[in-house]
């Protein structure tokens, strides 16, 4: 929820910056910021206990509609620390299990069935 709060803070900062420079902002943009604050309050406040999985999915879809529709609400940043190349462990020798013909003890003595 901290990321949602950061997006809300950035939106209100941009709103007041625009308001101080131009003196006016369209009501539709202000309504979108109010909806953003309502969603943040609903997810972080006392109403979060009543939000179901379907409600959460609808809120996420609404946030994607809000993000980028106005210059006030920025798209969220997704950071991926994953790489395209993954190391594999091919240097490991596969263990001979008890299904195998050759079995050994903990002292590396072979067990032979008579």
Curated annotation (Swiss-Prot):
Q: Which superkingdom is the protein from?
A: Viruses
Q: Which GO terms describe its cellular component?
A: virus tail
Task: From the Swiss-Prot or TrEMBL record, state where the protein is found.
Answer: Virion
Primary location class? virion
Q: Which UniProt keywords apply?
A: Viral tail protein, Virion
What functional role does this protein have? Forms the tail hub together with tail hub protein A (THA).
* Assembly behavior: Heterotrimer with THA. The heterotrimers further assemble as 12 docking hubs that anchor the trimeric tail fibers.
Q: What is the protein's given name?
A: Tail hub protein B
Query: What organism does this protein naturally occur in?
Result: Bacteroides phage crAss001
């Amino acid at each position: 929820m901290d990321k949602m709060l950061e997006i809300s803070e950035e939106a209100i900062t941009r709103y007041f910056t625009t308001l101080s420079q131009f003196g006016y902002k369209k009501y539709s943009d202000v309504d979108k910021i109010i909806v953003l604050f309502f969603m943040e309050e609903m997810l972080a406040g006392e109403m979060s206990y009543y939000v179901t999985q379907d409600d959460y999915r609808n809120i996420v879809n609404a946030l994607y509609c809000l993000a980028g529709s106005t210059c006030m609400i920025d798209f969220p940043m997704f950071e991926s620390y994953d790489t395209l190349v993954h190391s594999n462990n091919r240097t490991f020798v596969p263990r001979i299990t008890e299904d195998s013909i050759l079995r050994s003890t903990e002292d590396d003595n072979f067990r032979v069935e008579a």
